[in-house]
């Protein structure tokens, strides 16, 4: 059966993360049978990492605040998590299903495909987002 996405519900969750006035900084999109639907959401990145278990595949849209004291900016990441115990067929479908997620999640600085929990570490993601941002005008850098 072909995978579908609940666009309205996923778009509402996506917009919640994009809203600077919202405390929600991440949302997951998970499979409910053959339909991608919004999953959990929260204000603590560590709680997001707990969703990424070895038997799960999911997509996540995450907001990070970057910059220095003079200039704070929101940067967004699209993360595809594929757990170690996910079957080969499901792994393959995840790549094609991501196109459905990208119909909703259209604005992000960097995309990640991760199956190793070490790569989910907040410092690693922040570092990659900083590299994707181009020139570094941080006053503390030399």
From Swiss-Prot:
Major place of residence: cytoplasm
InterPro entries: ADF-H, ADF-H/Gelsolin-like_dom_sf
Residue positions, PTM Phosphoserine: 23, 141
One cellular component (GO) term of this entry: nucleus
Record has Nucleus as a keyword: yes
Keyword Chaperone attributed: yes
Location in the cell: Cytoplasm; Cytoplasm, Cytoskeleton; Nucleus
Record keywords: Acetylation, Actin-binding, Chaperone, Cytoplasm, Cytoskeleton, Nucleus, Phosphoprotein
Organism field: Rattus norvegicus (Rat)
PANTHER family named among the record's database cross-references: COACTOSIN-LIKE PROTEIN, CORTACTIN AND DREBRIN
Region annotation (Flexible and important for F-actin binding) ranges: 66-75
Family the UniProt entry places it in: Belongs to the actin-binding proteins ADF family. Coactosin subfamily.
Residues found modified as N-acetylalanine: 2
Modified residues (N6-acetyllysine): 102
GO MF annotation list: actin binding; actin filament binding; enzyme binding
Entry function: Binds to F-actin in a calcium-independent manner. Has no direct effect on actin depolymerization. Acts as a chaperone for ALOX5 (5LO), influencing both its stability and activity in leukotrienes synthesis.
Protein name: Coactosin-like protein
SUPFAM superfamilies: Actin depolymerizing proteins
One GO term (biological process): defense response to fungus
Positions of the ADF-H domain: 2-130
Subunit composition and interactions: Interacts with 5-lipoxygenase (ALOX5/5LO) in a calcium-independent manner. Binds to F-actin with a stoichiometry of 1:2.
């Amino acid at each position: 059966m072909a995978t579908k996405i609940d666009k309205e519900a996923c778009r509402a969750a996506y917009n919640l993360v994009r809203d600077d006035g919202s405390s929600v900084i991440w949302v997951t999109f998970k499979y409910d049978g053959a339909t991608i639907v919004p999953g959990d959401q929260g204000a603590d990145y560590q709680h997001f990492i707990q969703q990424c278990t070895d038997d799960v595949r999911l997509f996540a849209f995450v907001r990070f605040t970057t910059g220095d004291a003079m200039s704070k900016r929101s940067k967004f990441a699209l993360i595809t998590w594929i757990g170690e115990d996910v079957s080969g067929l499901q792994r393959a479908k995840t790549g094609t299903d991501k196109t459905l997620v990208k119909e909703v999640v259209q604005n992000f600085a960097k995309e990640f495909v991760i199956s190793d929990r070490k790569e989910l570490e907040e410092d690693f993601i922040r570092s990659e987002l900083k590299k994707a941002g181009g020139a570094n005008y941080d006053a503390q850098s030399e």
